[in-house]
Regions:
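Hydrophobic alpha-helical segments within soluble ligand-binding/sensing domains
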Residues: 159-184, 199-200, 223-231, 249, ...
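Short acidic capping loops at alpha-helix termini that bridge into adjacent secondary structure
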Residues: 180-181, 212-215, 262-268
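Alpha-helical recognition/docking segments in bacterial nutrient-uptake
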Residues: 1-2, 60-172, 176, 229-236
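Short beta-strand elements in bilobed, periplasmic/extracellular small-molecule ligand-binding domains
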Residues: 88-99, 206-223
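Flexible loop/turn connectors
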Residues: 229-351
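An alpha-beta-alpha
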Residues: 170-208, 312-331
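N-terminal helix-turn-helix DNA-binding module of bacterial transcription factors
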Residues: 1-61, 76, 335, 347, ...
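Short, solvent-exposed amphipathic alpha-helices that sit
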Residues: 38, 76-90, 166-170, 192-211, ...
Length: 351
C-alpha cells in the first residue's frame, strides 16, 4: 500500500528544513524564489497534501477566500473569478465561488455561510443596497472587499470602475453625430453602477435638451430580456442604443444581425466591454472599456492584505474606464447622411 507523503518527505526531497517547507506552504515567512520552487517541485513530485485542519489550528486560517457574484454567466464576473484566483493562489489561497443570481436572499445566505468559518475573507459584487444588510450576516471586522458596486450607507473597502466620463463621451458623440433618440439598457435599478450610469445619461440628455429621453431608459433584470427590449426601443423610434455591459452588448448586436438592420445606417450601437478581445467580435462599434482584469487583480491583493491585517483601511479605489469610438462615426459618415437626410442639421432634428 502506497504511504501518504509527509512533510518530512518533502523537506528531504527538497533538501531543506521542515520549518522551511512549512513557511513556504503557509506563507508565514519570506523564502527565496529558488528555495520556494524546490519545495513546490517536491510537493508536486510526492503528491503531498497538507493537513488542512492542522494548518488551520496552527495559523488560524482556512486558506480559503469566498467570491460572491450576482451572475456567473455574465462575462464580466466570469473574468473576475479568474483574475481574483490568479492573485490569491500565489499567496496560497483557494477560491470558493457563490452565484447569487442577483437575489438578495441568496446573497445573505451565501455571506452567512462563507463567513461562518468556511473562508478567511470575501470579495463580493453585492446585490444589497446597504452595508448593514451584509454586516448582519458576518462577524465584526470580517475581511471583505466590495467589487464593481458601492453601498449607499458606507464607503466600505471597494474596487469600482469609474465610467462616468467615458459614458458621457459616448453619449455626446452619438448626439453630435445626429442621434438623439438613444435607448439606454442598464442593469437592476438598485445597484450603484446602474444609478451612476443613468445619472450621466439624464445629465447629457438635459444638456442637449432632449426631454423625451426618460422613456428610453430600460432596466434589465435578466440578460435574456435585453433582446425584447431592443425590439421595443427600435419600434419606439430609437436610432441608437447603448448597452452597459458586455453580455447586453452582444445581445443588441445579435438583434441587429437577426433583423438584418444596417449598422451605422438604420441603427447605431454603443457597448460596454471588459476586454479588447471582446471588442474584436463587435464590428468595431463605439465602446466603453471597463478595466475588469485590473479590478479583479486589485481586489485579490486587497482581500489578502485585509486578511493579514483586519484593521487595514482601503476605502474606495476607482479605476477609470476608457471610451474608444473605434473611429466608427468617421468611417460611417457617408452612410449616416444616406438615411434620407443629406443635411446634417436636418438629420439631427429628425433622429
Amino acid at each position: 500500500m502506497h504511504m501518504k507523503a509527509k512533510i518530512t518527505d518533502v523537506a528531504q526531497r527538497a533538501n531543506v528544513s521542515i520549518s522551511t517547507v512549512s513557511h513556504v506552504l503557509n506563507h508565514t515567512r519570506f523564502v527565496s524564489e529558488e528555495t520556494r520552487k524546490k519545495v513546490m517541485d517536491a510537493v508536486e513530485e510526492l503528491g503531498y497534501s497538507p493537513d488542512a485542519s492542522g494548518r488551520t489550528f496552527r495559523t488560524g486560517k482556512k486558506m480559503m477566500i469566498g467570491l460572491v457574484v450576482p451572475d456567473i454567466t455574465n462575462s464580466v464576473f466570469a473574468s473576475l473569478i479568474e483574475d481574483v484566483d490568479d492573485v490569491i493562489s500565489k499567496h496560497g489561497y483557494n477560491l470558493v465561488i457563490s452565484n447569487t443570481r442577483d437575489c438578495l436572499k441568496t446573497e445573505k445566505q451565501a455571506v452567512r455561510n462563507l463567513a461562518s468559518g468556511v473562508v478567511d475573507g470575501i470579495v463580493i459584487a453585492p446585490t444589497s443596497e446597504d452595508f448593514q444588510t451584509i454586516k448582519q450576516q458576518m462577524p465584526d471586522k470580517f475581511p471583505m472587499i466590495f467589487m464593481d458596486r458601492v453601498l449607499s450607507d458606507r464607503n466600505y473597502d471597494s474596487v469600482i470602475a469609474d465610467c462616468q466620463e467615458a459614458t458621457a463621451k459616448m453619449l455626446r458623440e452619438m448626439i453630435e453625430n445626429g442621434f438623439r433618440k438613444i435607448g439606454f439598457l442598464v442593469g437592476v435599478p438598485w445597484i450603484s453602477s446602474t444609478y451612476e450610469r443613468v445619472k450621466i445619461y439624464r445629465q447629457i440628455m438635459e444638456q442637449y435638451e432632449i426631454p423625451e429621453s426618460e422613456q428610453y431608459i430600460r432596466y434589465i433584470d435578466r440578460q435574456k430580456d435585453s433582446y425584447d427590449e431592443v425590439g421595443k426601443l427600435f419600434a419606439a423610434g430609437c436610432t441608437a442604443i447603448v448597452a452597459t455591459n458586455t453580455a447586453m452588448t452582444h445581445i443588441v448586436l445579435n438583434y441587429v444581425e437577426d433583423k438584418n438592420l444596417k449598422l451605422g445606417e438604420e441603427i447605431v450601437v454603443g457597448g460596454f466591454v471588459d476586454s479588447d478581445f471582446a471588442n474584436r467580435f463587435m464590428y468595431k462599434i463605439p465602446v466603453v472599456y471597463e478595466p475588469m482584469e485590473e479590478m479583479g487583480k486589485l481586489a485579490g491583493e486587497m482581500i489578502v492584505e485585509k486578511i493579514e491585517d483586519k484593521n487595514k483601511k482601503f476605502s474606495v479605489k476607482a479605476l477609470l474606464c476608457e471610451y474608444d469610438s473605434n473611429d466608427f462615426y468617421r468611417k460611417q459618415a457617408a452612410k449616416y447622411k444616406g438615411t434620407g437626410n443629406t443635411d446634417s442639421t436636418q438629420t439631427k432634428s429628425t433622429l
